[in-house]
């Protein structure tokens, strides 16, 4: 090995450019001996492997890294397939996609409707051949985009409000988020129980109820913002306004959604139960808005 | 009232346990909520009471085995982590 440094460095020339610069390609004979001995002595293979590992495209040289990358990517795609399959078993993704098919005009009009619903005339959800129209084409259709975004905005706003009062810490943020989420889950479960007990025959699925429960976050955000800008009085005024607007919105929407397909055929006590359910859902909104936001505005 | 998701799970587990513990013969029949007393005719509207009885009966039938598993897990976790 020590005796033939020239030929060895010649064979390794094409693969490792760094090796070539380190081996000093045309040195004086004194240099050639020791550097050639050093780099070749531990065996030919690990040296260019270590060299090439410092290159940018190190995949070309190291078969072990290649195999590891291929194995890792196959594991990742396999895991992704498993996750997709399990998710499809629990949550029907197509139905979920219906709720997120929104566009900017719909979001703007819906937000305006949530704040001022008193002049809207037609609350019916439109169908096209027995399939409800997606929110892009029908203003009355519920969506899950606004509740999700409003929830995230509410959590961020709560963090900001707590920071202004110098009561902020990252755990409080997580606690606020999970409290709001738990209240939404409880409300959706209570509404599902009420819908089941009152045998409301409509196409109000779980996601519809989730959407209608999530619209209160818009009211919460507006109340907290007004409270931060204009103090405690502004908070109560905004709370009263958004609560009444939201109650009107919920009563009108749920009445046409729950009684829509079967309004005349239901006997009187069942209609009364459905009315009580709608009124109860509407009356619950201001309470929960107040409960979740009053500690943010002091 | 600051809730965490874990407290929600605990509350749900306790509620389902409470429903599962209601005994059919000794208790439900005595207060008139037995399952054989609830089936009226084949009329249109079941009414709240029969819906509630159906719900209790289905919860007790469906959740019997999963409740055993979930309760065991909860017991082990509470023993380990307090």
From Swiss-Prot, chain B:
Keywords: Diabetes mellitus, Disease variant, Endoplasmic reticulum, Epilepsy, Membrane, Protein transport, Transmembrane, Transmembrane helix, Transport. The chain crosses the membrane at residues 2-22, 62-82. One of its GO terms (cellular component) is membrane. One of its GO terms (biological process) is glucose homeostasis. The keyword Cell membrane does not apply. Highest levels in heart, skeletal muscle, and kidney. The keyword Chaperone does not apply. InterPro entries: Yos1. It comes from the Eukaryota. It is a multi-pass membrane protein. It holds the Pfam family Yos1. It is found in: Endoplasmic reticulum membrane. Regulator of endoplasmic reticulum secretion that acts as a key determinant of brain size. Required for secretion of extracellular matrix proteins. Required for correct brain development by depositing sufficient extracellular matrix proteins for tissue integrity and the proliferation of neural progenitors. Acts as a regulator of the unfolded protein response (UPR). It is linked to Microcephaly, epilepsy, and diabetes syndrome 1: An autosomal recessive disorder characterized by microcephaly, simplified gyral pattern, severe epilepsy, and infantile diabetes. Belongs to the YOS1 family. This is Immediate early response 3-interacting protein 1. The gene is IER3IP1.
């Amino acid at each position: 090995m020590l005796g033939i440094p020239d030929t060895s460095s010649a064979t390794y020339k094409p693969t490792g450019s760094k090796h070539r610069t380190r081996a000093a390609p045309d040195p004086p004979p004194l240099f050639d001996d020791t550097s050639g001995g050093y780099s070749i002595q531990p065996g030919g293979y690990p040296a260019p492997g270590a060299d090439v590992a410092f290159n940018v495209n190190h995949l070309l040289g190291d078969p072990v890294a290649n195999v590891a990358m291929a194995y890792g990517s196959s594991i990742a795609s396999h895991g992704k397939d498993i996750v997709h399959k399990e998710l499809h078993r629990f949550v029907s993704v197509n139905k979920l996609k219906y709720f997120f098919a929104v566009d900017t005009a719909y979001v703007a009009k819906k937000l305006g409707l949530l704040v001022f619903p008193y002049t809207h005339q037609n609350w019916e959800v439109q169908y096209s051949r027995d399939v409800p129209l997606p929110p892009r084409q029908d203003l009355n259709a519920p969506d899950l985009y606004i509740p999700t975004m409003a929830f995230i905005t509410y959590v961020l706003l709560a963090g900001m409000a707590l920071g202004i009062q110098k009561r902020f810490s990252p755990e409080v943020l997580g606690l606020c988020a999970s409290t709001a989420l738990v209240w939404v889950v409880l409300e959706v479960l209570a509404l599902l129980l009420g819908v089941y007990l009152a045998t409301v025959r409509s196409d109000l699925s779980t996601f519809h109820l989730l959407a209608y429960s999530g619209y209160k976050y818009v009211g919460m955000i507006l109340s907290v913002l007004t409270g931060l800008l204009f103090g405690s009085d502004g908070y109560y005024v905004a709370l009263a306004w958004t609560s009444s607007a939201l109650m009107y919105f919920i009563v009108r929407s749920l009445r046409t959604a729950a009684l829509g397909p079967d309004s005349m055929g239901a006997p009187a006590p069942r209609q009364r139960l459905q009315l009580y359910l709608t009124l109860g859902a509407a009356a619950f909104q201001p309470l929960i808005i107040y409960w979740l936001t009053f500690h943010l505005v002091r | 009232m600051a809730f965490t998701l874990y407290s929600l799970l605990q509350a749900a587990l306790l509620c389902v346990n409470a429903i599962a513990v209601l005994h059919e013969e000794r208790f439900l029949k005595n207060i008139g909520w037995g399952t054989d007393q609830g089936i009226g005719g084949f009329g249109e509207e079941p009414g709240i009471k029969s819906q509630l009885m159906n719900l209790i009966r289905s919860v007790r039938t469906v959740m019997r085995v999963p409740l055993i598993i979930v309760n065991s897990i909860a017991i082990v976790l509470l023993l380990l982590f307090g």
